[in-house]
Protein backbone atom coordinates (compact mmCIF):
# COMPACT_ATOMS: atom_id res chain seq x y z
CA UNK A 1 0.00 0.00 0.00
CA UNK A 2 1.23 3.50 -0.87
CA UNK A 3 2.48 5.51 2.08
CA UNK A 4 0.18 8.43 1.17
CA UNK A 5 -2.90 6.14 1.22
CA UNK A 6 -1.81 4.60 4.54
CA UNK A 7 -1.46 8.09 6.04
CA UNK A 8 -4.94 9.09 4.78
CA UNK A 9 -6.39 5.98 6.42
CA UNK A 10 -4.69 6.81 9.73
CA UNK A 11 -6.32 10.26 9.61
CA UNK A 12 -9.72 8.60 8.97
CA UNK A 13 -9.22 6.36 12.03
CA UNK A 14 -8.46 9.45 14.16
CA UNK A 15 -11.58 11.20 12.86
CA UNK A 16 -13.70 8.07 13.42
CA UNK A 17 -12.59 7.91 17.07
CA UNK A 18 -13.20 11.65 17.46
CA UNK A 19 -16.75 11.36 16.04
CA UNK A 20 -17.40 8.31 18.24
CA UNK A 21 -16.54 10.40 21.32
CA UNK A 22 -18.64 13.36 20.13
CA UNK A 23 -21.71 11.15 19.70
CA UNK A 24 -21.74 10.44 23.44
CA UNK A 25 -21.30 14.14 24.33
CA UNK A 26 -24.56 15.44 25.95
CA UNK A 27 -24.28 18.84 24.20
CA UNK A 28 -24.09 17.09 20.80
CA UNK A 29 -27.02 14.79 21.67
CA UNK A 30 -29.13 17.87 22.48
CA UNK A 31 -28.34 19.44 19.08
CA UNK A 32 -30.33 17.10 16.81
CA UNK A 33 -29.00 18.53 13.53
CA UNK A 34 -25.38 18.11 14.61
CA UNK A 35 -26.09 14.67 16.07
CA UNK A 36 -27.67 13.54 12.77
CA UNK A 37 -24.75 14.89 10.72
CA UNK A 38 -22.17 13.21 12.98
CA UNK A 39 -24.13 9.92 12.98
CA UNK A 40 -24.05 9.93 9.17
CA UNK A 41 -20.31 10.71 9.16
CA UNK A 42 -19.70 7.88 11.65
CA UNK A 43 -21.69 5.46 9.48
CA UNK A 44 -19.80 6.58 6.34
CA UNK A 45 -16.41 6.07 8.02
CA UNK A 46 -17.17 2.78 9.77
CA UNK A 47 -16.60 0.30 6.94
CA UNK A 48 -13.32 1.77 5.67
CA UNK A 49 -11.94 2.15 9.23
CA UNK A 50 -12.82 -1.42 10.24
CA UNK A 51 -11.32 -2.74 7.00
CA UNK A 52 -8.12 -0.75 7.65
CA UNK A 53 -7.92 -2.14 11.21
CA UNK A 54 -8.18 -5.66 9.71
CA UNK A 55 -5.33 -4.70 7.37
CA UNK A 56 -3.17 -3.59 10.31
CA UNK A 57 -3.97 -6.85 12.14
CA UNK A 58 -2.91 -8.85 9.06
CA UNK A 59 0.36 -6.88 9.00
CA UNK A 60 0.94 -7.81 12.66
CA UNK A 61 0.20 -11.46 11.81
CA UNK A 62 2.92 -11.36 9.12
CA UNK A 63 5.45 -9.96 11.63
CA UNK A 64 4.51 -12.63 14.21
CA UNK A 65 4.79 -15.39 11.60
CA UNK A 66 8.21 -14.09 10.51
CA UNK A 67 9.40 -14.30 14.13
CA UNK A 68 8.08 -17.86 14.46
CA UNK A 69 9.92 -18.87 11.26
CA UNK A 70 13.17 -18.35 13.19
CA UNK A 71 12.15 -20.99 15.77
CA UNK A 72 14.33 -24.11 16.06
CA UNK A 73 11.27 -26.41 16.21
CA UNK A 74 10.40 -27.61 12.64
CA UNK A 75 6.69 -28.07 13.54
CA UNK A 76 6.43 -24.44 14.67
CA UNK A 77 8.25 -23.29 11.52
CA UNK A 78 5.80 -25.27 9.37
CA UNK A 79 2.83 -23.72 11.18
CA UNK A 80 4.43 -20.27 10.86
CA UNK A 81 4.90 -20.77 7.11
CA UNK A 82 1.17 -21.50 6.78
CA UNK A 83 0.22 -18.45 8.87
CA UNK A 84 2.61 -16.26 6.90
CA UNK A 85 1.02 -17.30 3.57
CA UNK A 86 -2.52 -16.72 4.90
CA UNK A 87 -1.68 -13.28 6.32
CA UNK A 88 0.06 -12.20 3.08
CA UNK A 89 -2.96 -13.33 1.01
CA UNK A 90 -5.28 -11.50 3.39
CA UNK A 91 -3.25 -8.29 3.02
CA UNK A 92 -3.65 -8.40 -0.78
CA UNK A 93 -7.41 -9.03 -0.50
CA UNK A 94 -7.90 -6.22 2.03
CA UNK A 95 -5.82 -3.81 -0.08
CA UNK A 96 -8.26 -4.38 -2.98
CA UNK A 97 -11.24 -3.79 -0.65
CA UNK A 98 -9.69 -0.58 0.69
CA UNK A 99 -9.01 0.64 -2.84
CA UNK A 100 -12.73 0.33 -3.68
CA UNK A 101 -13.80 1.91 -0.36
CA UNK A 102 -11.48 4.88 -0.98
CA UNK A 103 -12.99 5.63 -4.40
CA UNK A 104 -14.58 9.08 -4.65
CA UNK A 105 -18.26 8.86 -3.73
CA UNK A 106 -20.93 10.53 -5.83
CA UNK A 107 -22.63 12.83 -3.29
CA UNK A 108 -25.95 12.26 -5.09
CA UNK A 109 -25.89 8.45 -4.77
CA UNK A 110 -28.26 8.49 -1.78
CA UNK A 111 -30.65 11.00 -3.35
CA UNK A 112 -34.19 10.13 -4.38
CA UNK A 113 -34.84 10.36 -8.12
CA UNK A 114 -37.28 11.47 -10.76
CA UNK A 115 -37.64 8.69 -13.30
CA UNK A 116 -38.85 9.84 -16.70
CA UNK A 117 -39.82 7.29 -19.39
CA UNK A 118 -40.78 8.60 -22.83
CA UNK A 119 -41.96 6.68 -25.87
CA UNK A 120 -39.70 7.28 -28.87
CA UNK A 121 -39.80 5.79 -32.35
CA UNK A 122 -42.38 3.07 -32.88
CA UNK A 123 -45.76 4.70 -32.23
CA UNK A 124 -48.21 2.62 -30.16
CA UNK A 125 -45.66 -0.15 -29.64
CA UNK A 126 -43.17 2.37 -28.16
CA UNK A 127 -45.84 3.58 -25.72
CA UNK A 128 -46.62 -0.02 -24.69
CA UNK A 129 -42.89 -0.63 -24.17
CA UNK A 130 -42.67 2.55 -22.05
CA UNK A 131 -45.36 0.99 -19.85
CA UNK A 132 -43.33 -2.24 -19.63
CA UNK A 133 -40.21 -0.31 -18.62
CA UNK A 134 -42.05 1.66 -15.96
CA UNK A 135 -43.52 -1.57 -14.57
CA UNK A 136 -40.01 -3.10 -14.55
CA UNK A 137 -38.61 -0.18 -12.51
CA UNK A 138 -41.63 -0.21 -10.17
CA UNK A 139 -41.15 -3.90 -9.43
CA UNK A 140 -37.42 -3.43 -8.91
CA UNK A 141 -38.26 -0.59 -6.50
CA UNK A 142 -40.56 -2.97 -4.58
CA UNK A 143 -37.72 -5.46 -4.10
CA UNK A 144 -35.59 -2.61 -2.72
CA UNK A 145 -38.42 -1.35 -0.48
CA UNK A 146 -38.38 2.00 -2.30
CA UNK A 147 -41.51 4.11 -2.66
CA UNK A 148 -42.83 5.05 -6.12
CA UNK A 149 -45.07 8.12 -6.55
CA UNK A 150 -46.37 8.96 -10.03
CA UNK A 151 -45.98 12.68 -10.77
CA UNK A 152 -47.58 12.92 -14.20
CA UNK A 153 -48.68 10.61 -17.03
CA UNK A 154 -49.64 10.88 -20.68
CA UNK A 155 -51.20 7.56 -21.58
CA UNK A 156 -50.83 5.86 -24.96
CA UNK A 157 -53.93 5.25 -27.09
CA UNK A 158 -53.48 1.47 -26.98
CA UNK A 159 -51.92 1.12 -23.54
CA UNK A 160 -48.67 2.13 -21.94
CA UNK A 161 -47.47 5.73 -21.82
CA UNK A 162 -46.35 8.41 -24.22
CA UNK A 163 -44.64 9.82 -21.13
CA UNK A 164 -44.59 9.03 -17.42
CA UNK A 165 -42.67 10.74 -14.63
CA UNK A 166 -42.42 9.25 -11.14
CA UNK A 167 -40.58 10.04 -7.94
CA UNK A 168 -38.71 7.07 -6.43
CA UNK A 169 -37.58 7.49 -2.84
CA UNK A 170 -35.55 5.27 -0.55
CA UNK A 171 -32.00 4.29 0.30
CA UNK A 172 -29.36 4.58 -2.44
CA UNK A 173 -31.87 5.08 -5.28
CA UNK A 174 -29.80 7.36 -7.55
CA UNK A 175 -26.65 5.29 -7.02
CA UNK A 176 -28.38 2.19 -8.38
CA UNK A 177 -30.56 3.71 -11.11
CA UNK A 178 -28.27 6.42 -12.53
CA UNK A 179 -26.92 4.11 -15.26
CA UNK A 180 -30.45 3.58 -16.67
CA UNK A 181 -30.48 6.93 -18.52
CA UNK A 182 -30.39 6.53 -22.28
CA UNK A 183 -32.24 4.89 -25.17
CA UNK A 184 -33.79 1.47 -24.52
CA UNK A 185 -34.66 -0.46 -27.68
CA UNK A 186 -37.16 -3.31 -27.97
CA UNK A 187 -37.43 -5.94 -30.71
CA UNK A 188 -40.64 -7.97 -30.67
CA UNK A 189 -43.78 -8.88 -32.59
CA UNK A 190 -46.56 -6.42 -31.67
CA UNK A 191 -49.96 -7.89 -30.77
CA UNK A 192 -51.47 -6.00 -33.71
CA UNK A 193 -48.97 -7.54 -36.19
CA UNK A 194 -50.79 -10.21 -38.21
CA UNK A 195 -47.76 -11.26 -40.29
CA UNK A 196 -45.65 -12.11 -37.23
CA UNK A 197 -42.94 -9.61 -38.18
CA UNK A 198 -40.54 -8.33 -35.53
CA UNK A 199 -40.75 -4.56 -35.03
CA UNK A 200 -38.14 -2.33 -33.41
CA UNK A 201 -39.25 0.47 -31.08
CA UNK A 202 -37.45 2.67 -28.62
CA UNK A 203 -37.98 4.60 -25.40
CA UNK A 204 -35.87 7.20 -23.67
CA UNK A 205 -35.24 6.89 -19.94
CA UNK A 206 -33.92 9.76 -17.83
CA UNK A 207 -32.97 9.32 -14.18
CA UNK A 208 -32.56 12.66 -12.42
CA UNK A 209 -31.42 13.03 -8.82
CA UNK A 210 -34.01 14.88 -6.74
CA UNK A 211 -32.37 18.03 -5.44
CA UNK A 212 -32.88 18.68 -1.70
CA UNK A 213 -34.45 22.10 -1.17
CA UNK A 214 -31.38 23.43 0.64
CA UNK A 215 -29.16 22.54 -2.34
CA UNK A 216 -31.55 23.45 -5.16
CA UNK A 217 -30.23 25.82 -7.80
CA UNK A 218 -31.88 29.20 -7.64
CA UNK A 219 -34.77 29.60 -10.07
CA UNK A 220 -35.83 33.16 -10.76
CA UNK A 221 -39.65 33.39 -10.77
CA UNK A 222 -39.37 35.99 -13.56
CA UNK A 223 -37.94 33.21 -15.77
CA UNK A 224 -41.07 31.09 -15.37
CA UNK A 225 -44.27 30.97 -17.39
CA UNK A 226 -46.97 29.18 -15.39
CA UNK A 227 -50.15 27.88 -17.05
CA UNK A 228 -53.07 26.12 -15.38
CA UNK A 229 -55.40 23.74 -17.17
CA UNK A 230 -57.93 21.04 -16.43
CA UNK A 231 -56.45 17.69 -15.53
CA UNK A 232 -57.37 14.70 -17.66
CA UNK A 233 -57.27 10.99 -16.98
CA UNK A 234 -57.64 9.25 -13.63
CA UNK A 235 -58.89 11.01 -10.54
CA UNK A 236 -62.65 10.95 -10.83
CA UNK A 237 -64.98 13.85 -11.59
CA UNK A 238 -63.20 16.25 -9.25
CA UNK A 239 -60.14 16.76 -11.46
CA UNK A 240 -62.19 17.89 -14.43
CA UNK A 241 -64.05 20.60 -12.50
CA UNK A 242 -61.03 22.71 -11.55
CA UNK A 243 -57.94 23.99 -13.31
CA UNK A 244 -55.71 22.00 -10.96
CA UNK A 245 -53.09 20.89 -13.50
CA UNK A 246 -49.93 22.98 -13.84
CA UNK A 247 -47.55 23.58 -16.73
CA UNK A 248 -44.33 25.45 -15.94
CA UNK A 249 -42.01 26.68 -18.70
CA UNK A 250 -38.48 27.76 -17.80
CA UNK A 251 -38.04 30.49 -20.42
CA UNK A 252 -34.18 30.65 -20.58
CA UNK A 253 -33.81 26.91 -21.29
CA UNK A 254 -37.21 26.06 -22.80
CA UNK A 255 -37.67 23.21 -20.29
CA UNK A 256 -41.38 22.43 -19.81
CA UNK A 257 -42.80 20.48 -16.87
CA UNK A 258 -46.42 19.43 -16.41
CA UNK A 259 -48.01 17.96 -13.31
CA UNK A 260 -51.65 16.94 -12.99
CA UNK A 261 -51.72 13.84 -10.78
CA UNK A 262 -52.19 15.67 -7.47
CA UNK A 263 -55.64 16.83 -6.30
CA UNK A 264 -54.74 20.46 -5.66
CA UNK A 265 -53.12 23.10 -7.84
CA UNK A 266 -50.77 23.92 -4.95
CA UNK A 267 -49.49 20.32 -4.75
CA UNK A 268 -49.14 20.07 -8.53
CA UNK A 269 -47.13 23.29 -8.59
CA UNK A 270 -44.82 22.05 -5.80
CA UNK A 271 -44.23 18.76 -7.64
CA UNK A 272 -43.66 20.52 -10.96
CA UNK A 273 -41.11 22.89 -9.37
CA UNK A 274 -39.29 19.93 -7.84
CA UNK A 275 -39.11 18.16 -11.24
CA UNK A 276 -37.97 21.42 -12.88
CA UNK A 277 -35.18 21.84 -10.30
CA UNK A 278 -34.05 18.24 -10.95
CA UNK A 279 -34.05 18.79 -14.73
CA UNK A 280 -32.09 22.04 -14.51
CA UNK A 281 -29.58 20.45 -12.11
CA UNK A 282 -29.28 17.49 -14.50
CA UNK A 283 -28.54 19.89 -17.37
CA UNK A 284 -25.81 21.56 -15.25
CA UNK A 285 -24.34 18.16 -14.36
CA UNK A 286 -24.39 17.01 -17.99
CA UNK A 287 -22.57 20.18 -19.07
CA UNK A 288 -19.90 19.61 -16.40
CA UNK A 289 -19.64 15.88 -17.19
CA UNK A 290 -19.23 16.63 -20.91
CA UNK A 291 -16.30 18.92 -20.11
CA UNK A 292 -14.70 16.21 -17.96
CA UNK A 293 -15.43 13.52 -20.54
CA UNK A 294 -13.44 15.44 -23.15
CA UNK A 295 -10.41 14.78 -20.91
CA UNK A 296 -11.32 11.22 -19.88
CA UNK A 297 -14.10 9.16 -21.46
CA UNK A 298 -15.94 6.80 -19.10
CA UNK A 299 -17.47 3.69 -20.62
CA UNK A 300 -20.35 3.69 -18.15
CA UNK A 301 -22.06 6.61 -16.48
CA UNK A 302 -22.16 9.31 -19.15
CA UNK A 303 -25.96 9.25 -18.73
CA UNK A 304 -26.36 10.60 -22.25
CA UNK A 305 -30.06 10.37 -23.07
CA UNK A 306 -29.37 9.98 -26.79
CA UNK A 307 -27.01 7.04 -26.24
CA UNK A 308 -28.48 3.61 -27.08
CA UNK A 309 -27.69 1.64 -23.97
CA UNK A 310 -29.77 -1.54 -24.05
CA UNK A 311 -31.72 -3.84 -26.37
CA UNK A 312 -34.56 -6.12 -25.27
CA UNK A 313 -34.99 -8.89 -27.86
CA UNK A 314 -38.20 -10.80 -27.06
CA UNK A 315 -38.07 -13.54 -29.75
CA UNK A 316 -34.67 -14.66 -28.42
CA UNK A 317 -35.38 -13.87 -24.74
CA UNK A 318 -32.18 -11.83 -24.85
CA UNK A 319 -31.19 -8.57 -23.19
CA UNK A 320 -27.98 -6.77 -24.15
CA UNK A 321 -26.34 -3.80 -22.44
CA UNK A 322 -24.18 -2.27 -25.17
CA UNK A 323 -21.94 -0.22 -22.86
CA UNK A 324 -20.31 -3.24 -21.22
CA UNK A 325 -21.08 -5.89 -23.86
CA UNK A 326 -23.25 -7.77 -21.39
CA UNK A 327 -25.70 -10.27 -22.93
CA UNK A 328 -28.11 -12.26 -20.78
CA UNK A 329 -30.81 -14.72 -21.79
CA UNK A 330 -32.96 -13.69 -18.82
CA UNK A 331 -35.27 -11.17 -20.46
CA UNK A 332 -38.46 -12.29 -18.69
CA UNK A 333 -36.82 -12.10 -15.26
CA UNK A 334 -35.37 -8.65 -15.94
CA UNK A 335 -38.61 -7.09 -17.19
CA UNK A 336 -40.35 -8.66 -14.19
CA UNK A 337 -38.14 -6.48 -11.99
CA UNK A 338 -35.00 -8.56 -11.39
CA UNK A 339 -32.67 -5.78 -12.51
CA UNK A 340 -29.82 -6.59 -10.14
CA UNK A 341 -28.14 -8.85 -12.73
CA UNK A 342 -27.64 -5.72 -14.87
CA UNK A 343 -27.31 -2.99 -12.23
CA UNK A 344 -24.49 -4.75 -10.35
CA UNK A 345 -22.19 -5.33 -13.39
CA UNK A 346 -22.73 -1.68 -14.41
CA UNK A 347 -21.74 -0.48 -10.94
CA UNK A 348 -18.68 -2.77 -10.98
CA UNK A 349 -17.65 -1.42 -14.40
CA UNK A 350 -18.02 2.13 -13.10
CA UNK A 351 -15.80 1.25 -10.12
CA UNK A 352 -13.22 -0.19 -12.52
CA UNK A 353 -13.32 3.08 -14.52
CA UNK A 354 -12.71 5.08 -11.34
CA UNK A 355 -9.86 2.78 -10.25
CA UNK A 356 -8.25 3.12 -13.69
CA UNK A 357 -8.55 6.91 -13.46
CA UNK A 358 -6.91 6.86 -10.01
CA UNK A 359 -4.09 4.77 -11.44
CA UNK A 360 -3.55 7.36 -14.20
CA UNK A 361 -3.24 10.21 -11.73
UniProtKB/Swiss-Prot annotation:
Principal subcellular localization: cytoplasm
Positions bearing N5-methylglutamine: 237
MF GO annotations: translation release factor activity, codon specific
Region feature Disordered, mapped onto this chain: 286-305
HAMAP family for the chain: Rel_fac_1
Function description: Peptide chain release factor 1 directs the termination of translation in response to the peptide chain termination codons UAG and UAA.
Name used for this protein in its record: Peptide chain release factor 1
Organism: Pseudoalteromonas translucida (strain TAC 125)
Taxonomic lineage: Bacteria, Pseudomonadati, Pseudomonadota, Gammaproteobacteria, Alteromonadales
